[in-house]
Design a protein with these regions (language model features):
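Extracytoplasmic catalytic/substrate-binding loops of multi-pass membrane glycan-assembly enzymes
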Residues: 57
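Catalytic cores of eukaryotic secretory-pathway lumenal/extracellular enzymes that build
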Residues: 64-67
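Flavin (primarily FAD) cofactor-binding/catalytic cores of flavoenzymes
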Residues: 1-53, 69-483, 494-600
Length: 600
């Protein structure tokens, strides 16, 4: 008898969940997965919320699934269309398409009170009118349920008093287009050309749209931020040190820089619990950024600085959409000419004088709009962008909410006791006592990508179902450090989370084990490489024959691109420091245990 598994959503998480369940079916667990997707194609948010010129800011090396890679010749960062092509090829290669049911909207999920099985009810899109749904309700019975609907579901619109006045003042203009909308409705530059544009939110989408507006020929662009952001380029190659420019052909993706050894592998529980690795990393990076770019706020970031207690990778999601920074920095950049001759960050020529002197103005969120459509900004004395905007008459013709999304699980029957991702207390994947429901893809890394995390989460969930997860699970130390008042609490450190899941399921390789099985080359790659999912398929229950080849070629390339100096600064030095720190901790732990202490 098959064990039916229903997967809701055919984005990257749903696809990898389906593929992994198929591959790990056995006599005892004959998984028979199907995927229900309410849209007419796969891809999820990458398909239906994309726009012209949009690219992934996570690298192909990290984003691609562990055993289905792009060619070495492919650019490091994919356009959204390229990524959708990749997902289609993935589904075809692993024969998932026959298991994906498109145009199926899940309307109710309840439990059979006698068997505990999940009853998943859905309707299909009407053939006569694709905007409507058929009345016929179809119900399937499943032993397992994977919820893969994603983090980006319902657009969020923070309330701003008087925003309707922008609409009223623009409605008299014929053919002017929509004047207030969410970022998911933005599709191309024609929506911004020759307009006064205001963008609310400084996440990656917000800053990307600010750049798009500048390049579209907008008359004015105002980018509004609540509390600032931390800007870093998605690849490192635009530096000049003592007149020597970095090699433009050897770009290093930012998400491939964090090393494994002693940062995520062989970390003592005391060190892990203290997060000292994150704090030391932040301390060093701030000083290096000051030396190279003149500011600690971010990489070549002269405005929009976060509060000191939130400035660092331990606290926030890095904003890797860096293209707008030359336009934002222009009124604020003030660096000593002598220091600039020692080291500097090189802005792209096409975004610099004499090609352009356009400015994107940074401002606080408006407190309200006047009846004439003018935005009123609060005075924040500690913020230089706020001081600069005081007295400015800003009357946007277009306001874009780049304010993120919330999640909704209206299909869960209220009387059936289903959890939500916030209540998934087993590694943010399942709730204790209800392991048959897995939430895949509901965490977001500070630096990294959700698709490879979804792959590791699926491996963990399958191991959990089969009773193959280590017990008891150690306490989690992978969450970003956020305050209780923060809206988003699902942030994780990519490397720490991936490594934790790998250890939980017996997929984290040992150094001696790696050398014995695969030799020095793979061992060095593991030590100096980032937390790629492929590393966790060298040993353990999800071992893959393709993993060593991927590591010896593609992942090795990310290490050699750094060069000798880069591997010293980003590899040997931090590795030596953390190894020393962990060695002392293990030594102290032995003494502590000898005298009867217990280490969690």
């Amino acid at each position: 008898m098959s064990l039916k598994a229903i997967i809701i959503g055919a984005g990257p998480a749903g696809l990898v969940a389906c593929k992994s369940l198929l591959e790990n079916a056995s006599e005892e667990y004959p998984f028979d997965p199907i995927v229900l997707e309410q849209e007419n194609d796969i891809g999820g948010t990458f398909r239906y919320r994309s726009y012209e010129n949009s690219h992934l800011v996570s690298s192909k090396q990290l984003t691609c699934f562990s055993d289905f890679r792009l060619p070495m010749s492919h650019p490091d960062h994919m356009s959204l269309e390229s990524y959708l092509d990749y997902l289609r090829a993935y589904a075809q290669h692993f024969q998932l398409t026959e298991r994906i049911k498109l145009n199926c909207k899940v309307i109710n999920v309840s439990r059979d009170r006698f068997t505990g099985e999940h009853l998943v009810s859905f309707v299909m899109r009407s053939l006569e009118n694709p905007r409507e749904w058929d009345q016929l309700v179809i119900t399937l019975r499943a032993r397992y349920l994977a919820v893969c609907t994603g983090l980006h579901v319902l657009p969020q619109f923070p309330k701003i008093e008087g925003i309707e006045h922008v609409v009223e003042n623009q409605s008299v203009k014929q053919g002017s287009g929509k004047s207030v909308f969410h970022s998911h409705e933005y599709k191309n530059r024609s929506q911004l050309a020759d307009k006064r544009v205001m963008i609310l939110g400084t996440g990656e989408t917000g800053t990307d749209l600010a750049y798009e507006a500048a390049k579209a020929g907008a008359k004015e662009v105002v980018l509004c931020t609540r509390g600032g952001f931390l800007s870093m380029p998605h690849e490192l190659n635009h530096f000049e040190i003592f007149g020597l420019k970095s090699d433009a052909e050897k770009k290093v993706p930012l998400d491939c820089l964090i090393t494994n050894l002693a940062e995520t592998a062989y970390v003592h529980p005391w060190i892990e619990r203290s997060h000292i690795r994150w704090f030391v990393s932040d301390f060093v990076i701030k000083r290096v950024l000051w030396l190279l770019t003149g500011t600690q706020a971010g990489c070549n970031q002269w405005v929009g600085q976060l509060e000191p207690h939130r400035l660092g990778r331990a606290y926030v999601f890095l904003n890797k959409s860096h293209k707008a920074m030359p336009y934002l920095n222009r009124p604020f950049r003030d660096r000593n000419a002598f220091l600039d001759r020692i080291a500097r960050y090189i802005d792209p020529p096409e975004d610099s004088p004499p090609q352009t002197d356009f400015i994107v103005d940074l401002a606080p969120f408006p407190s309200h709009f006047l009846p004439n459509g003018q935005a009123i900004f609060p005075l924040l004395p500690k913020r230089k962008d706020s001081l600069r905007m005081m007295g400015r008459d800003v009357r946007p013709e277009v306001v874009i909410y780049a304010t993120g999304y919330t999640q909704e699980f209206a299909f869960f029957d209220k009387d059936s006791g289903y959890a939500t991702p916030e209540e998934a207390n087993i590694r943010n994947i399942a709730r204790e006592g209800d392991e048959s429901v897995g939430f895949i893809g509901f965490v977001r890394p500070g630096v990294g990508a959700i698709p490879p995390i979804a792959e590791m989460q699926t491996f963990f969930w399958i191991s959990l179902i089969k009773g193959q997860v280590r017990k008891p699970l150690p306490p989690p130390h992978y969450h970003l450090l956020v305050e209780d008042t923060e809206r988003i609490k699902y942030g994780v450190d990519h490397s720490t989370y991936m490594s934790t899941l790998a250890k939980d399921i017996g997929a984290a390789p040992g150094l001696w084990q790696l050398w014995r099985l695969y030799g020095t080359h793979v061992l060095v790659c593991y030590c100096f490489g980032a937390a790629f999912t492929t590393f966790y398929r060298l040993v353990g229950p999800y071992k893959s024959a393709s993993a060593p080849g991927v590591i010896r070629t593609e992942i090795w390339d990310t290490i050699t691109r750094r060069g000798i100096l880069g591997n010293m600064i980003m590899g040997v030095i931090p590795m030596t420091f953390y190894l020393t720190l962990n060695t002392f901790a293990y030594g102290a732990g032995l003494v502590y245990s000898f005298f009867g202490g217990h280490i969690e």
